[in-house]
């Protein structure tokens, strides 16, 4: 493997290892929030995602590209924002209502929310919970800070309501 003919292979192995560490760091930092929500292919899909993100690091030489540098590109951040931990329960399919999300203010809200109409629910479900969280994650230092708003529980009925959740953003 030290032969110059294997230089590209060494670069690929290095970047694959870095992507695997980044994906594990994200999964571990999300902890219990995704433990029961993920699907059996989440790890594979995260690896694919981080491979795409890593390619957006145009500063570092091949073999040394970093997720942290790539995330300075808004396109890379958009990839992460659109990732669903469970492909069979994507937010856009489960929540059939537009919502307001302001990541810089730490707020999430839904106006005129009618749970029985606006949520795809399992048969027999009578109640649901909305959990809103924000994760600060430093891929270079492996430091993470997960903050969570108080969960909101509600009946799956036809009574319109306003959902408004806010949290203090993490430092990391």
Predicted regions located by residue number:
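Long, polar/Ser/Thr-enriched low-complexity segments
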Residues: 1-87
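Charged linear interaction tracts used for macromolecular binding and regulation
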Residues: 55-172
């Amino acid at each position: 493997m030290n032969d110059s003919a294997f230089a590209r292979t060494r670069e690929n192995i290095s970047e694959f290892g870095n992507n695997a560490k980044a994906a594990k760091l994200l999964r571990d930092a999300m902890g219990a929030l995704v433990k029961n929500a993920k699907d059996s292919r989440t790890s594979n899909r995260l690896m694919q995602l981080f491979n795409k993100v890593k390619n957006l690091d145009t500063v570092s030489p091949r073999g040394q590209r970093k997720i942290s540098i790539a995330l300075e590109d808004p396109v890379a951040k958009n990839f992460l924002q659109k990732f669903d931990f469970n492909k069979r329960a994507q937010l856009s399919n489960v929540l059939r209502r537009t919502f307001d999300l302001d990541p810089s203010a730490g707020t999430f809200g839904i106006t005129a929310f009618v749970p029985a109409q606006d949520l795809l629910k399992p048969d027999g479900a009578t109640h649901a919970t909305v959990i809103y969280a924000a994760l600060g994650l430093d891929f270079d230092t492996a430091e993470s800070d997960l903050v969570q708003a108080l969960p909101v529980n509600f009946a799956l009925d036809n009574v319109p309501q306003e959902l408004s959740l806010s949290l203090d953003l993490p430092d990391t």
